[in-house]
Amino acid sequence: MKKIVEMTHDIMRNYTKSKGIAVDFTMGNGYDTLFLAQQDFAKVIAFDIQEESLMRTKALLQKEKQLAKVNLICDGHENLDAYVSAFDVGIFNFGYLPQTDKCVTTKLATSKIAVEKALACLAVHGVLLLVLYPGHEEGKKEADYFLEKAKALPSKQFAICHIALMNKKQAPSILVIERQAKG
């Protein structure tokens, strides 16, 4: 079976638009940002609150010669509306920056705000992916909240799919939200 990152990339690849905008709401080590930059998007925007994430991502993008169309933002994803008014593809990889302090994680309080704003900015026929990690305390809160929240989204506006390993209780999962129509 493919790894979560491969699955998310396969899904996002299907939504690439040559004049579109993609957003990585949780930059981390920059692998999703790099993937989006390598696609046919006109612009890629990536957020993280940790300067270390920006430095790692910038180095990765420079090494791969993909920095030109990417805007790296050191700010919380809950402030996305100061930088983004609309986008076609977006991804949240909730949790913590690998190989760093696991106490610094995304928080449900700010993640709720960010996802709400992202849904408002998501273009018709665009997709928003939420990668949920219930294996740590804050991640469990986020997973529980977003799985319930997704059920309440209007079906005339959104199509929603949850991809999960059924026999691994704390395995990461992907919530795929496609906008069908404006509300």
Region spans (language model):
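S-adenosyl-L-methionine
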Residues: 1-20, 31, 55-85
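Class I SAM-dependent methyltransferase core
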Residues: 24
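Conserved SAM-binding motif I beta-strand of class I
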Residues: 43-48
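Mobile active-site "lid"/loop adjacent to the S-adenosyl-L-methionine
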Residues: 94-114
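Conserved beta-strand signature within the Rossmann-like core of class I S-adenosyl-L-methionine
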Residues: 121, 125-132
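Class I S-adenosyl-L-methionine
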Residues: 139-183
